[in-house]
From Swiss-Prot:
Entry protein name: Uridine kinase
GO terms of molecular function: ATP binding; cytidine kinase activity; uridine kinase activity
Primary location group: cytoplasm
UniProt xrefs under InterPro entries: P-loop_NTPase, PRK/URK, Uridine_kinase, Uridine_kinase-like
């Protein structure tokens, strides 16, 4: 955990795929933005840092294990966190789930008082953990995560139910048990029931609000 006197405070939200991380992050961002303004708080998804696969064929890209730490460009994310905390802007990568690689575009992100960083593998990397001012693990039962993942990937990412189920059985569940669940030990706060846990969200809001004082 880092010194809270840094210019940019980084709050990490980790947990299984479809556990409710993004919902908690977006709820905190929306409600805190109403209090402090858009210039003081932002959200960065770890998904933006999947490695560039433009040099691979589509056949090779779709075989990528997206739930293994090696699929992430954590070195770039680590560099970007350091830049934000030192007051420098970053160019956030844009990842396409349809093309299974980065796009040529980036999003310009200015340092904020608080940045909420959310993703499945955040707490598996000691470099990233050391840049977080505090961290949250969203602890949602895997059967609920699976139902949410099917709905999301079919409706929003254009995938078939069979492909979602095959990926879940082959990589998502095994990688959760091997990497993501063990990383829960590094979280400062564990939130059960995901984005439906209003009491937990209010507690997190109160904690993050301290950084604006």
């Amino acid at each position: 955990m880092t010194d809270m006197s840094h210019q940019c405070v980084i709050v990490g939200i980790a947990g299984a795929s479809a556990s409710g991380k993004s919902l908690i992050a977006s709820t905190l961002y929306r409600e805190l933005r109403e209090q402090v303004g858009d210039e003081h708080i932002g959200v960065i998804p770890e998904d933006s840092y999947y490695k560039d696969q433009s040099h691979l064929s589509m056949e090779e890209r779709v075989k990528t294990n997206y739930d293994h730490p090696s699929s992430m460009d954590h070195s770039l994310l680590f560099q970007h966190l350091q830049m934000l905390k030192s007051g420098q802007p970053i160019e956030l990568p844009v990842y396409s789930y349809v093309e299974h690689t980065r796009t040529p575009n980036t999003i310009h992100v200015e340092p904020k008082k608080v940045i909420i960083l959310e993703g499945i593998l955040l707490l598996t990397d000691a470099r990233l953990r050391n840049e977080l001012n505090f961290s949250i693990f969203v602890d949602t039962p895997l059967d609920i995560c699976l139902m949410r993942r099917i709905k999301r990937d079919v409706n929003e990412r254009g995938r078939s139910m069979d492909s979602v189920m095959a990926q879940y059985q082959k990589t998502v569940r095994p990688m959760f048990l091997q990497f993501i669940e063990p990383s829960k030990q590094y979280a400062d706060i564990i939130v059960p029931r995901g984005g439906k846990n209003r009491i937990a969200i209010d507690i997190l809001k109160a904690k993050i609000s301290q950084f604006f004082e």
